A protein has these predicted regions:
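A cytosolic small-molecule/anion-sensing beta-strand core signal
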Residues: 50, 78-79, 99-100, 118
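Short glycine/proline-enriched turns and hinge-like loops at secondary-structure junctions
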Residues: 68-70, 98, 116-118
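A short, N-terminal "cap"/entry segment at the start of jelly-roll beta-barrel domains
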Residues: 1-55, 139-149
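Well-ordered beta-strand positions in beta-sheet-rich domains
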Residues: 56, 95-97, 113
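Short, conserved beta-strand element in jelly-roll/cupin
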Residues: 58-59, 68-88, 125
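Ligand-binding loop in jelly-roll beta-barrel domains
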Residues: 108-138
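Conserved short histidine dyad/triad with adjacent acidic residue
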Residues: 39-40, 53-69
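Short acidic-glycine-tyrosine-enriched beta hairpin
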Residues: 88-108
């Protein structure tokens, strides 16, 4: 394939489609999507795969302690440094620190609290319909599911 053909195909795939147009292959610019988010702790869906959603979010400060009884949750740090505190996880209480390019999977049922001393930009992967504040817990940081950007 020539360089111009490759460039043309790349341009054809580099577009944004509405969620209703699933089934199309597309390039998603995570940096551009995150730039559309004004506040912190407001995850927004950028893609779906089967029953899983990929959500971008900006965070700063401490979130609340919460757990997801029925599902694991994946954190991928794109920029910044995130600490996740745990209570009674598989290894007991503790915390981990994730930097840009690192990820962690919090097992289902493990109580956790993400914390960031400065703004962190990250990608979350979790099943469709998961409430960001966990099982039964709601507060001012609880956001409506399935908000696409």
């Amino acid at each position: 394939m020539s360089q111009s053909q490759s460039h043309s195909q790349s341009q054809a795939l580099n577009h944004t489609t509405a969620p209703a147009e699933r089934g199309q292959c597309e390039s998603i610019d995570l940096t551009a999507k995150i730039a559309l988010i004004d506040g912190h702790w407001q995850p927004r869906v950028v893609a779906e795969m089967n029953d899983y959603q990929f959500k971008v979010v900006k965070v700063e400060g401490e979130f609340q302690w919460h757990r997801h009884t029925d599902t694991d949750e994946t954190f991928i740090v794109l920029e910044g440094e995130l600490r996740i505190d745990f209570r009674a996880g598989p290894s007991g209480d503790g915390s981990i620190v994730l930097r840009a390019g690192q990820m962690a999977v919090v097992p289902k049922g493990v109580e956790h609290k993400p914390c960031a001393n400065a703004e962190v930009k990250m990608l979350l992967i979790e099943p469709r319909g998961v409430v960001n504040t966990g099982d039964g817990a709601t507060d001012e940081r609880t956001v409506e599911n399935d908000q696409w950007i």
